[in-house]
A protein has these predicted regions:
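Structural motif
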Residues: 40-42, 163
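Flexible, D/E/H-enriched segments
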Residues: 1-39, 50-149, 177-288, 372, ...
Length: 455
């Protein structure tokens, strides 16, 4: 289910008529939920507190929510939490090795990602239910899928008649005049996602490319993936109720009803096999730069030893010096990135080896890479050209040039070129300055550089 606040009459004030398909579909879905007389409704929402490496579950016995931040404080509701379910789910997740629980609450109020669908449910559902509100995280798709399995196991063990609502919009980049603009990936994501909903082909939720999703500005995918896991190895009846995007954001409503066991729908195992094959293919096509970065980190993390430059490296790696950045990703999500603007080692090979180890163990944004993560790490190596000063933004190009912003006190921020989600020079400079602790009002200089990227 999507969660546009404008669909609530007190917020939309008539504008909700422009998404009448979604309104009507919401009412049908709410009536279906009401007919099931659920004891517990679990909502997955991307707008509760989120963490990169932790799946938050709202704590406490009850909570209130309103649309005050959207100009309608009178549109409000209060909910009773299913504390027994929350405790049991936390335990199931712990047994599965999934970091989830009630720690880290910041705002106890019910967010609009949950409040929008529950407003419709409350209109249709006259029997009382208890709520479980689950956030998403920056962890990979398999973690979210397995978390969904924990939700289903919890409901079964407690004997709870449970409905899961996967709250999330699709792409936010469907129209040039929309609030987030247009990207060609937007309509394509929505097409593929709605096809997956119509066919209950949940494998697609697990295999979307992360950079593609960033370009499409996707909101709901982790929610959908948790829901998919809750229906692991279960045959489904699918009722695709609506899709539209008149405001530039994709809204889809789809209902799934379990029909019984179906072992062929074990998408978690299928995804692991898919990922294994894809990684083997990637490892087989590595060039010398990427292979050296991988071997360096694997030796340090796995054996505690730094490697020497292996025989057979290209002359350019041994005879030239350059700044190097090594980036690590896991499940398409950044896992570490460290490097040097100018060369600090004897040659490019030594620069790669040192930066690879640092990216995996010394990036302050992340915990060090663990040995069991090594098979899932994807490496890229950027070899930097010499920086050159620029005097205006017209000399910059986010696809072609990286930027270095420097200010007094040794402050320096660097951003590599051609990064997903960074489409303008202003955004590129803003991020580089933020990384360097540089304010727009400070006196600063800008340099540009090109890279040769090895992936």
């Amino acid at each position: 289910m999507p969660h546009p606040p404008i669909i609530i009459p007190a917020v939309g004030k008539g504008e909700e008529a422009k998404i009448s398909k979604t309104v009507n579909a919401y009412r049908k879905a709410a009536e279906l939920i009401a007919s099931m007389k659920p004891e517990t409704i679990l909502v997955t929402t991307p707008h509760s507190v989120t963490y990169a490496d932790y799946l938050h579950i709202s704590p406490g016995s009850s909570a209130k929510g309103s649309f005050a931040r959207f100009g309608a404080p009178q549109a409000a509701a209060e909910f009773t939490y299913d504390t027994e379910f929350v405790a049991a789910l936390t335990g199931e997740a712990k047994k599965a090795g999934i970091p989830a629980g009630t720690f880290g609450e910041k705002d106890p109020s019910v967010d609009h990602g949950a409040l929008v669908p529950l407003t419709f449910v409350n209109e249709a559902c006259k029997s009382p239910y208890r709520l479980v509100r689950c956030s998403v995280s920056g962890l990979g798709p398999l973690v979210h899928y397995n978390y969904g399995k924990c939700i289903a196991e919890t409901a079964e063990k407690l004997g709870r008649r449970t409905v899961i609502i996967a709250s999330g919009d699709l792409s936010h980049k469907l129209k040039v005049d929309g609030p987030y603009g247009f990207a060609k990936e937007g309509p394509e994501f929505d097409r593929q996602a709605t096809d997956a909903m119509k066919s209950a082909g949940f494998m697609r939720f697990l295999t979307f490319d992360n950079e593609f999703c960033e370009a499409a500005a996707v909101c709901g995918l982790p929610s959908f993936t948790i829901m998919a896991g809750a229906f692991d190895r279960i045959a489904l009846q699918t009722d695709f109720l609506s899709y539209e995007g008149p405001f530039g954001v994709g809204y889809a409503v789809c209902a799934f009803t379990p029909l019984g066991k179906d072992e062929s729908r074990d998408f978690g195992s299928q995804y692991m096999e898919y990922r294994h094959k894809a990684m083997n293919k990637r490892r087989g096509s590595e060039d010398a730069y990427v292979r050296l970065a991988r071997l360096s980190l694997e030796s340090w993390v796995g054996k505690g030893r730094r490697i020497s430059a292996p025989e057979g490296l290209p002359d350019e790696m041994l005879q030239k010096r350059a700044g190097v950045f090594v980036s690590l990703k896991k499940d398409g999500i950044l896992r570490g990135c460290i490097g040097t603007i100018l060369p600090t080692q004897e040659n490019t090979a030594e620069e790669i080896m040192r930066s690879a180890v640092s990216a995996g163990t010394r990036d302050p944004r992340f915990s060090p890479v663990a040995p069991d993560e090594l098979p899932d790490i994807v490496y890229s190596v950027d070899v930097l050209g010499a920086p050159e000063p620029v005097s205006s933004e017209s000399e910059l190009d986010v696809k072609r040039y990286g930027v270095i912003v420097q200010a007094g006190g040794g402050r320096c921020g660097l951003l590599l070129p051609d990064l997903p989600g960074i489409d303008t020079v202003k955004a590129q400079l803003h991020i580089a300055m933020r990384k360097g602790g540089i304010k727009p009002s400070d006196s600063y200089s800008v340099e540009r550089f090109q890279v040769v990227r090895h992936t």
